Structures are given as C-alpha cells and as structure tokens.
Curated annotation (Swiss-Prot):
Protein name as annotated: CST complex subunit STN1
Compartments reported by the entry: Nucleus; Chromosome, Telomere
DNA-binding region(s), chain positions: 54-157
Gene: stn1
Region of interest (Winged helix-turn-helix (wHTH) 2), ranges: 296-368
GO biological process: telomere capping; telomere maintenance; telomere maintenance via telomere lengthening
Keywords in alphabetical order: Chromosome, DNA-binding, Nucleus, Telomere
Function of the protein: Component of the CST complex proposed to act as a specialized replication factor promoting DNA replication under conditions of replication stress or natural replication barriers such as the telomere duplex. The CST complex binds single-stranded DNA with high affinity in a sequence-independent manner, while isolated subunits bind DNA with low affinity by themselves. Initially the CST complex has been proposed to protect telomeres from DNA degradation. However, the CST complex has been shown to be involved in several aspects of telomere replication.
GO molecular function, one term: single-stranded telomeric DNA binding
Amino acid sequence: MQPASLEETPSLLWGLDPIFLAFAKLYIKDILELKESQQVPGIFFYRGHPIKQVDVLGTVVFVREKENFYSYGVDDSTGVISCTCWKSTAPTEVSSPGTSARHVSSSSKDLDVMMRELYKEESKKAKLDIGDTIRVRGSIKVFRDQREIVASVFYKVEDPKLDIQMARMFDLPYMYRNVYDKPFAIPEHLKDSSAGQTDHHIVTQSHLIMLLSEKVKVFLMENKIHNFYQRELESVDSLIAIASRPVSDFKTIESMESSNSKQIRSIFKEAIQLLLKEGYIFQKDQNREVYQVTDQDKDLHKLTLNIIKEDCRRQKHAEKGCHFLHILTCVRLSVGSSVSEAVLRRVIDTLEGNSDIVSTMENYYTAF
C-alpha cells in the first residue's frame, strides 16, 4: 500500500503514468487495500500510481449464477475477490422467422447454424466450476461497500502442468520491484511550485488554471459541497493563495493591486470553465450563477436512474437498453440544456460503479 502521507496526483496528470491505462497485474490482497481517489470515483492508487483496471489469475472458490452474469470468487493465495462476468447475449438470427424457405439461401442457413454453435461454445466457456483456474481483466468497482472486479475479459485457463501459474509467480515480483513499487514521480516542470519552491517563481496562466481547478476539486470533495457561487470560492484563503501567484503571460494594467485582483477573478473563472468542460460541475438553467457539483447532485443521479428504468420497460429499449444520447435528451428535457455529455458520463459512471445500471454494449445501458 502507498503511504498515507503520499499526496494524490492531480487527475490531469494521470495520463503521464503508463500504468493508468494498462491492466495492472496486482496481488488480490493489494487490490482490496488500494486507496480510492478523492477526485474521481472508481480510480484507485498504489504508491502514487493511478489504477483503473487490473489483471488477476487465480482459482475459483465460489460460483453464483444470476440471469445476466456469473459472480466468481477468485483466490490467488493472497486474498479472495468477487468478479462479475457477464453472460453473452444470444445472437440474432440472420434469417427472420417469417421468411419463406425458398427465399433463404443456403449460405444464410449455414451462417445461422454457425452463429448458434459459436454461441453455445461461448456459453460453455463462460461457465466455470469451483477449482477451475480463471484469468480476469476488468475494472475495479465498489458494490455495497465490497470491492469487486467487473470483467471486460475472462476465460478458463487450461494449465495442467501449471506453466502459466508458475510464469505468473515469477512475473509479479519482477513487476512490483521494477514498476509498481517505484512511486510515480511528476515531472519537475509540472510540480506545484508552492511546495518547496520560492514565491517569486513564475508560472504560465494555463498551468495556474489547471492547478487551481485540481485544488477546487479537492476542496469541493473534502467539504462535500453541493453547490456554490464563484465569489464563495474567491473567499477561500488556500485557493486565493494559488490564484494570486505571479503569472508570466498575464497582461498587466495600471496598478499592481488592480492587476492582481483582475488576475484572481480571471483565473477562478477559467478554472471553473475547465471543471464545466470536464463535467465535474454544471449549471441549471434557472440560476446561471450557481454551480452544481455533479457527484453531490443526488437528484440528477436519481433522475437519470429513473429514466433508464422506465424506458427499459418499453419494448423499444427492452433488449439493448437505452442509448447514451437518448438518456441525455431525456435528462435535458427535465433539467435543462446545460447538462453536458461530460456531466452525464460522470453520472452514468457513478451509477454503473454502484451497480445500479449495467452496460449491455457500448453506449447502451439498462437497469435491474
């Protein structure tokens, strides 16, 4: 585990760490103990490395079958974690039932047969028993305060001579020693110059905006703020200290005092615009001066969930679920056009992370 004192890396810099977009091969014990990000739900940290997806190999120790998925307990000898593995949907037949036999070509019939056979084989491989070896790659989720893996890929490992498991035993210590246990270091030119650097250090305006937006995120998260005015943020000393730092490309005007106050307002405004673009906050049409914090707006989450539940009962959406753009249109009809795609993506990710909804395919969602 990373030390408790290790400061969380700003989310805008996570992409600099190659582990972020990779499937991290971690011990299950470490996955269960990862510290969750305060900035973005569903992201975890190991020694400063942002972890989104993991790759585990272990023995199936329990099996629970539901209508749409299997839940496998996977044990790698360091711990046990539940893995949600979705069942494949039945293939749609190439030839429609109402088509007369003389109009159906032999190649179409053959394709129907092949698709059915492939589906049967895939269904067989998805069903594992206790004692089988399984490999799972997927995202870490938290459901009912229990950490689990929602699989994007999973399969039974045929390893009678234990070659694959032995290779894994040698591979993981090497990865830990040379990659995971080496803390992620932010490049010097991107570090917060307020930590250990002199006050007269000049930064660019774009860097200051990015830095302030990250600090605002942390401030909103730690204080569980639901909504705010810009002027309220401008009264927070820790945020003012960042926004008032000297900027190399900010145009000076008549006096230093007026220049500094104008810079602070401008930096705050741009930082808020960045948060709006990311979907971290949004505005309701009724009051454009108030900013709503997306993660704290329970009404928006409830509205989105109800839209998906209600529409998935209709025949049109019963099979595949609701498309993202359809959900967005319905939400905008209720809340207003100010709800951006980025805001809804954040809400959808939270609902999916809580297992309130599931993705049936790319950009399609359904609710239980």
